[in-house]
Each structure stands twice: as C-alpha cells, then as structure tokens.
Amino acid sequence: MLERAFFTVTSYADYKEKSEEKIKKGIIARKDLEKASIEELAIGTYLNFNFFHTPISDQVDFIGIERRLQTNIHDYNALPAKQQLEMDIPLQNIEVGHTPASIRESLLEKVFKMGDKFVRAVKKEYAPGIIGPFSLQSVITKDLEMIVYDVSLRVPGNPIVATTSPYTKYQYGTTFGIGRRIAMEIKRAVEEDRIKEIVT
C-alpha cells in the first residue's frame, strides 16, 4: 500500500475510471477512497520552506528550502512531450528524496511573512502554539503567488538543508540543520531556566 496514493483527473468520468482501476489493482481501497480529499492541482514551482519557532525569544528562524524528488513523475517530465504521449505509462508521486533549493531575494519577504503568519495563527488557535520546526509545503504560481498546500509539523527528513542552506549562515554565521537548531534551543532554555516553555 502506498503512503500517499495520489492520482490526477480531468473530469468526473476520468475520476471514476482511474479510481476503479486502482481499486482493482489493490493500490487503494474503496473505503479509503470514500474518505479521500479532492484538491485542485496548483501549477507552479513546488518548494518546502523550513522554519523554526522559538518561544524563548518569540522569533521565527528561516532554516532553508528544499524540493521533493518523486518517482516516477520527475524523470517522466524530463522527456519530450511526444515521447510522453507515446509511452502511456501511469504516473506516481512517490517521494524518494530531496534536492536543495533557493529563492530569488525579492521573494524572501513573502516567505518570512508566511512563516510569521503561520506561527501567529497556530498560537491563536492552539495555545501555546508551534514549538520548534515546521515546514510550509508551497507552490509559487506564474503570478508569484505563494500557496501553502500542506504543513509538516515535525523534524523534516531532509538532511541536505544542514549543508546547503545559506539562510542560517546569514542569521547565525554558520550553516546548520534542524537537529542543531533544536540543540541550540534546549541549551539556551536550560541556561535561562526556561525549559518548561519549550516542552509539552
């Protein structure tokens, strides 16, 4: 069973045909399909923006950016359109890794605002709010609109950020990942006798 059995459709008839085919092949179960969500596919560049919120100083650190590598969609998209049409193979979005990314500087302010806005919203709705790392999985459209389509509230499985991101270096003078940022937070909380503020 796939962790995420995504598939794309262009109409209700297409949905019925593809879902029945996947049920017959055992890729998805009918009972799971009945609970599934249907989402609009946003066309643009997909990026994961990784942040860290520290309650100690109530600031949001921007840790870095990466992109998912997915099979078989990524390599399939590298083929010329004519070959794609001739091959007629089923596409899947199975995550197999990550690749580092950056963003043009004129868009950075939008990224920072997204992180700050998310932290404020979570604090308002679910006190005490987000503590530690989170990732805003986003797409940037052709109009440079940033759409967050999913949120990851955990230590991201992308160790490449620790060695490739320039953003922690701008703020702290060195490049590091989420693990070291968590360690820095714990050390500071212990030194200031505020450990209860970062654990639940």
Where are these regions (language model features)?
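Hydrophobic "anchor" residues on beta-strands that sit immediately upstream
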Residues: 146
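ATP-dependent carboxylate/phosphate-activation module, predominantly the ATP-grasp catalytic core
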Residues: 51-122, 152-183
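A generic structural micro-environment signature
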Residues: 15, 44-48, 71, 75, ...
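Active-site nucleotide/adenylate-binding loops and adjacent lid/helix of ATP-dependent enzymes
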Residues: 1-67, 101-117
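Cysteine/selenocysteine-centered motifs that mediate thiol-based redox chemistry or coordinate metal-sulfur cofactors
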Residues: 180-200
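Solvent-exposed amphipathic alpha-helical surface segments
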Residues: 121-126, 193
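A short glycine-rich, hydrophobically flanked beta-strand micro-motif that places a catalytic Asp/Glu
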Residues: 38-39, 50, 126-143
